[in-house]
Amino acid sequence: MSVPTVLEKILVRKAEEIAARRAIVSLAELEQQVASVDAPRGFANALITQARLKLPAVIAEVKKASPSKGVIRENFLPGEIARSYQAGGATCLSVLTDVDFFQGSDAYLQEARAACNLPVIRKDFMIDPYQVVEARALGADCILLIVSALEDGQMAELADVAKRVGLDVLVEVHDGDELERALKTLDTPLVGVNNRNLHTFEVSLETTLELLPRIPRDRLVITESGILNRADVELMEINDVYSFLVGEAFMRAEHPGAELLRLFFPERKLAASGPSID
Protein backbone atom coordinates (compact mmCIF):
# COMPACT_ATOMS: atom_id res chain seq x y z
CA MET A 1 0.00 0.00 0.00
CA SER A 2 1.63 3.24 -1.20
CA VAL A 3 0.59 6.14 1.03
CA PRO A 4 1.04 9.66 -0.42
CA THR A 5 3.40 11.89 1.57
CA VAL A 6 0.77 14.44 2.66
CA LEU A 7 -1.57 11.66 3.76
CA GLU A 8 1.28 10.01 5.65
CA LYS A 9 1.84 13.21 7.65
CA ILE A 10 -1.87 13.48 8.37
CA LEU A 11 -2.06 9.89 9.62
CA VAL A 12 0.93 10.31 11.94
CA ARG A 13 -0.65 13.41 13.43
CA LYS A 14 -4.04 11.69 13.63
CA ALA A 15 -2.62 8.87 15.78
CA GLU A 16 -1.21 11.48 18.18
CA GLU A 17 -4.56 13.29 18.27
CA ILE A 18 -6.47 10.11 19.09
CA ALA A 19 -4.09 9.28 21.95
CA ALA A 20 -4.60 12.78 23.39
CA ARG A 21 -8.39 12.54 23.07
CA ARG A 22 -8.48 9.09 24.65
CA ALA A 23 -6.60 10.47 27.67
CA ILE A 24 -9.40 13.01 28.21
CA VAL A 25 -12.49 10.95 27.31
CA SER A 26 -12.33 7.16 27.54
CA LEU A 27 -13.92 4.82 25.01
CA ALA A 28 -16.32 3.66 27.73
CA GLU A 29 -17.46 7.26 28.27
CA LEU A 30 -18.02 7.71 24.54
CA GLU A 31 -20.10 4.53 24.47
CA GLN A 32 -22.30 6.02 27.21
CA GLN A 33 -22.70 9.24 25.18
CA VAL A 34 -23.80 7.23 22.13
CA ALA A 35 -26.74 5.87 24.10
CA SER A 36 -28.18 9.38 24.51
CA VAL A 37 -27.71 10.91 21.04
CA ASP A 38 -30.46 11.32 18.44
CA ALA A 39 -31.18 8.33 16.21
CA PRO A 40 -29.26 8.25 12.91
CA ARG A 41 -31.02 10.06 10.06
CA GLY A 42 -30.29 7.44 7.39
CA PHE A 43 -27.42 8.77 5.28
CA ALA A 44 -27.20 5.88 2.81
CA ASN A 45 -30.96 5.53 2.47
CA ALA A 46 -31.40 9.25 1.69
CA LEU A 47 -28.83 9.09 -1.13
CA ILE A 48 -30.10 5.82 -2.58
CA THR A 49 -33.73 6.99 -2.55
CA GLN A 50 -32.87 10.20 -4.41
CA ALA A 51 -30.52 8.58 -6.92
CA ARG A 52 -33.08 5.87 -7.78
CA LEU A 53 -35.35 8.66 -8.98
CA LYS A 54 -32.51 9.75 -11.28
CA LEU A 55 -32.30 13.03 -9.40
CA PRO A 56 -29.06 14.57 -8.12
CA ALA A 57 -28.23 13.20 -4.66
CA VAL A 58 -25.82 15.86 -3.46
CA ILE A 59 -23.57 15.55 -0.43
CA ALA A 60 -22.75 19.22 0.22
CA GLU A 61 -19.54 19.85 2.10
CA VAL A 62 -19.02 22.20 5.03
CA LYS A 63 -15.31 22.90 4.65
CA LYS A 64 -13.28 25.88 5.82
CA ALA A 65 -9.82 25.01 4.50
CA SER A 66 -7.60 22.34 2.94
CA PRO A 67 -3.85 21.59 2.97
CA SER A 68 -3.50 22.35 -0.75
CA LYS A 69 -5.72 25.46 -0.96
CA GLY A 70 -5.43 27.02 2.51
CA VAL A 71 -8.50 28.87 3.77
CA ILE A 72 -11.34 28.39 1.27
CA ARG A 73 -14.06 30.31 3.10
CA GLU A 74 -13.42 33.20 5.51
CA ASN A 75 -17.09 33.79 6.40
CA PHE A 76 -17.46 30.30 7.88
CA LEU A 77 -20.70 29.77 9.81
CA PRO A 78 -21.55 26.03 9.77
CA GLY A 79 -25.16 26.38 10.90
CA GLU A 80 -26.00 29.00 8.30
CA ILE A 81 -24.19 27.04 5.59
CA ALA A 82 -26.17 23.91 6.53
CA ARG A 83 -29.49 25.77 6.30
CA SER A 84 -28.42 27.23 2.98
CA TYR A 85 -27.57 23.78 1.62
CA GLN A 86 -30.89 22.33 2.75
CA ALA A 87 -32.74 25.18 1.03
CA GLY A 88 -30.70 24.53 -2.11
CA GLY A 89 -31.72 20.88 -2.33
CA ALA A 90 -28.83 18.98 -0.73
CA THR A 91 -29.56 15.37 0.23
CA CYS A 92 -26.82 15.08 2.86
CA LEU A 93 -24.01 17.09 4.44
CA SER A 94 -20.30 16.36 4.79
CA VAL A 95 -18.54 18.18 7.64
CA LEU A 96 -14.77 18.31 8.02
CA THR A 97 -13.68 17.69 11.62
CA ASP A 98 -9.90 17.41 11.13
CA VAL A 99 -8.34 20.30 13.07
CA ASP A 100 -4.69 20.44 12.02
CA PHE A 101 -4.91 20.15 8.24
CA PHE A 102 -8.46 21.28 7.37
CA GLN A 103 -9.20 23.72 10.21
CA GLY A 104 -12.23 21.61 11.02
CA SER A 105 -13.92 21.00 14.36
CA ASP A 106 -16.25 18.56 16.09
CA ALA A 107 -18.35 21.59 17.00
CA TYR A 108 -18.84 22.39 13.29
CA LEU A 109 -20.47 18.99 12.78
CA GLN A 110 -22.78 19.49 15.74
CA GLU A 111 -23.70 23.03 14.66
CA ALA A 112 -24.41 21.99 11.07
CA ARG A 113 -26.52 18.98 12.04
CA ALA A 114 -28.53 20.95 14.60
CA ALA A 115 -29.34 23.62 12.00
CA CYS A 116 -31.02 21.29 9.48
CA ASN A 117 -32.76 17.94 8.98
CA LEU A 118 -30.15 16.39 6.69
CA PRO A 119 -28.02 13.30 7.46
CA VAL A 120 -24.36 14.16 8.08
CA ILE A 121 -21.10 12.36 7.39
CA ARG A 122 -18.10 13.01 9.61
CA LYS A 123 -15.32 13.74 7.10
CA ASP A 124 -12.08 12.85 8.83
CA PHE A 125 -9.23 10.38 8.62
CA MET A 126 -10.62 7.36 10.42
CA ILE A 127 -7.95 4.93 11.61
CA ASP A 128 -9.14 3.82 15.06
CA PRO A 129 -12.41 2.38 16.46
CA TYR A 130 -12.33 5.20 19.03
CA GLN A 131 -13.03 7.74 16.26
CA VAL A 132 -15.98 5.73 14.98
CA VAL A 133 -17.70 5.66 18.36
CA GLU A 134 -16.77 9.32 18.80
CA ALA A 135 -18.43 10.14 15.46
CA ARG A 136 -21.75 8.65 16.61
CA ALA A 137 -21.41 10.40 19.99
CA LEU A 138 -21.07 13.70 18.10
CA GLY A 139 -24.29 12.92 16.23
CA ALA A 140 -22.84 11.84 12.88
CA ASP A 141 -24.92 9.54 10.68
CA CYS A 142 -22.08 8.18 8.53
CA ILE A 143 -18.29 7.92 8.48
CA LEU A 144 -15.74 8.01 5.67
CA LEU A 145 -13.22 5.19 5.22
CA ILE A 146 -10.36 6.15 2.87
CA VAL A 147 -8.88 2.99 1.37
CA SER A 148 -5.47 4.58 0.73
CA ALA A 149 -5.15 5.29 4.46
CA LEU A 150 -6.07 1.82 5.72
CA GLU A 151 -5.09 -1.83 5.60
CA ASP A 152 -7.88 -4.28 4.78
CA GLY A 153 -8.09 -5.51 8.36
CA GLN A 154 -8.44 -1.96 9.66
CA MET A 155 -11.20 -1.23 7.16
CA ALA A 156 -13.16 -4.29 8.19
CA GLU A 157 -12.77 -3.52 11.90
CA LEU A 158 -13.87 0.11 11.53
CA ALA A 159 -16.87 -0.90 9.41
CA ASP A 160 -17.91 -3.47 12.03
CA VAL A 161 -17.78 -0.84 14.78
CA ALA A 162 -19.74 1.57 12.60
CA LYS A 163 -22.46 -1.02 12.08
CA ARG A 164 -22.63 -1.72 15.81
CA VAL A 165 -23.19 1.95 16.71
CA GLY A 166 -25.62 2.61 13.84
CA LEU A 167 -23.40 4.50 11.39
CA ASP A 168 -23.43 4.12 7.62
CA VAL A 169 -20.07 3.86 5.83
CA LEU A 170 -18.91 5.64 2.70
CA VAL A 171 -15.75 4.00 1.34
CA GLU A 172 -13.50 6.22 -0.78
CA VAL A 173 -11.28 4.92 -3.59
CA HIS A 174 -8.92 6.60 -6.04
CA ASP A 175 -8.00 3.80 -8.44
CA GLY A 176 -8.74 0.24 -9.52
CA ASP A 177 -6.57 -1.44 -6.89
CA GLU A 178 -8.30 0.46 -4.09
CA LEU A 179 -11.69 -0.33 -5.59
CA GLU A 180 -10.87 -4.03 -5.65
CA ARG A 181 -9.82 -3.92 -1.99
CA ALA A 182 -12.94 -2.00 -0.98
CA LEU A 183 -15.32 -4.39 -2.75
CA LYS A 184 -13.54 -7.42 -1.31
CA THR A 185 -13.48 -6.08 2.26
CA LEU A 186 -16.68 -4.09 2.76
CA ASP A 187 -20.37 -4.57 1.97
CA THR A 188 -21.36 -0.90 2.26
CA PRO A 189 -23.61 0.25 -0.60
CA LEU A 190 -21.80 3.62 -0.79
CA VAL A 191 -18.68 3.75 -2.99
CA GLY A 192 -17.08 7.17 -3.39
CA VAL A 193 -14.66 7.71 -6.27
CA ASN A 194 -12.31 10.61 -5.56
CA ASN A 195 -11.28 12.17 -8.85
CA ARG A 196 -8.28 13.84 -7.20
CA ASN A 197 -4.96 12.00 -7.51
CA LEU A 198 -3.50 12.04 -4.00
CA HIS A 199 0.05 11.93 -5.34
CA THR A 200 -0.21 14.76 -7.91
CA PHE A 201 -3.41 16.54 -6.70
CA GLU A 202 -4.60 16.63 -10.32
CA VAL A 203 -8.34 16.18 -10.79
CA SER A 204 -9.95 14.22 -13.62
CA LEU A 205 -13.57 13.08 -13.94
CA GLU A 206 -12.23 10.24 -16.07
CA THR A 207 -11.35 8.49 -12.80
CA THR A 208 -15.04 7.94 -12.06
CA LEU A 209 -15.87 6.99 -15.65
CA GLU A 210 -13.01 4.47 -15.85
CA LEU A 211 -13.93 2.73 -12.58
CA LEU A 212 -17.68 2.75 -13.20
CA PRO A 213 -17.89 -0.54 -15.18
CA ARG A 214 -16.08 -2.34 -12.34
CA ILE A 215 -18.53 -1.29 -9.62
CA PRO A 216 -21.47 -3.67 -9.03
CA ARG A 217 -24.90 -2.26 -9.84
CA ASP A 218 -26.07 -2.77 -6.27
CA ARG A 219 -23.59 -0.14 -5.06
CA LEU A 220 -24.24 3.60 -5.25
CA VAL A 221 -21.39 5.44 -6.96
CA ILE A 222 -20.62 8.87 -5.52
CA THR A 223 -18.32 11.03 -7.62
CA GLU A 224 -16.08 13.28 -5.51
CA SER A 225 -14.03 16.35 -6.54
CA GLY A 226 -13.98 18.16 -9.87
CA ILE A 227 -17.69 18.90 -10.33
CA LEU A 228 -17.53 22.57 -11.29
CA ASN A 229 -20.24 23.26 -13.88
CA ARG A 230 -23.43 21.94 -15.51
CA ALA A 231 -21.44 20.09 -18.17
CA ASP A 232 -19.69 18.08 -15.43
CA VAL A 233 -23.03 17.20 -13.83
CA GLU A 234 -24.56 16.22 -17.17
CA LEU A 235 -21.54 14.07 -18.07
CA MET A 236 -22.07 12.07 -14.88
CA GLU A 237 -25.83 11.79 -15.31
CA ILE A 238 -25.44 10.54 -18.90
CA ASN A 239 -23.33 7.75 -17.36
CA ASP A 240 -25.96 6.98 -14.69
CA VAL A 241 -24.06 8.62 -11.83
CA TYR A 242 -26.49 10.69 -9.79
CA SER A 243 -24.67 11.08 -6.48
CA PHE A 244 -22.11 13.82 -5.97
CA LEU A 245 -19.89 15.10 -3.17
CA VAL A 246 -19.08 18.77 -3.74
CA GLY A 247 -17.26 21.16 -1.44
CA GLU A 248 -14.96 23.80 -2.83
CA ALA A 249 -17.29 24.98 -5.63
CA PHE A 250 -19.96 25.73 -3.01
CA MET A 251 -17.63 27.10 -0.34
CA ARG A 252 -16.15 29.69 -2.70
CA ALA A 253 -19.62 30.96 -3.66
CA GLU A 254 -21.14 33.87 -1.74
CA HIS A 255 -24.32 31.84 -1.21
CA PRO A 256 -23.51 28.09 -1.08
CA GLY A 257 -27.12 26.91 -1.31
CA ALA A 258 -27.85 29.12 -4.30
CA GLU A 259 -24.75 27.74 -6.03
CA LEU A 260 -25.91 24.17 -5.32
CA LEU A 261 -29.28 25.02 -6.84
CA ARG A 262 -27.69 26.61 -9.93
CA LEU A 263 -25.39 23.66 -10.50
CA PHE A 264 -27.80 20.77 -9.88
CA PHE A 265 -31.37 22.11 -10.01
CA PRO A 266 -31.34 25.08 -12.43
CA GLU A 267 -35.10 24.83 -12.97
CA ARG A 268 -35.93 25.27 -9.26
CA LYS A 269 -36.13 28.27 -6.95
CA LEU A 270 -34.43 28.37 -3.55
CA ALA A 271 -36.64 26.88 -0.82
CA ALA A 272 -37.58 29.00 2.17
CA SER A 273 -35.26 28.13 5.04
CA GLY A 274 -35.60 30.87 7.61
CA PRO A 275 -32.65 33.16 8.36
CA SER A 276 -29.59 32.06 6.40
CA ILE A 277 -26.77 33.37 4.27
CA ASP A 278 -29.11 33.00 1.30
UniProtKB/Swiss-Prot annotation:
It is an enzyme of class 4 (lyase). Pfam families: IGPS. Belongs to the TrpC family. It comes from Pseudomonas savastanoi pv. phaseolicola (strain 1448A / Race 6) (Pseudomonas syringae pv. phaseolicola (strain 1448A / Race 6)). HAMAP family: IGPS_B (MF_00134_B). GO terms for biological process: L-tryptophan biosynthetic process. Pathway: Amino-acid biosynthesis; L-tryptophan biosynthesis; L-tryptophan from chorismate: step 4/5. This is Indole-3-glycerol phosphate synthase. The keyword Amino-acid biosynthesis applies. Keywords: Amino-acid biosynthesis, Aromatic amino acid biosynthesis, Decarboxylase, Lyase, Tryptophan biosynthesis. NCBIfam families: PRK00278.1-2, PRK00278.1-6, PRK00278.2-4. InterPro entries: Aldolase_TIM, Indole-3-glycerol_P_synth, Indole-3-glycerol_P_synth_dom, Indole-3-GlycerolPSynthase_CS, RibuloseP-bd_barrel. It catalyses: 1-(2-carboxyphenylamino)-1-deoxy-D-ribulose 5-phosphate + H(+) = (1S,2R)-1-C-(indol-3-yl)glycerol 3-phosphate + CO2 + H2O. The keyword Lyase applies. Its EC number is 4.1.1.48. One of its GO terms (molecular function) is phosphoribosylanthranilate isomerase activity. PANTHER family: INDOLE-3-GLYCEROL-PHOSPHATE SYNTHASE, TRYPTOPHAN BIOSYNTHESIS PROTEIN.
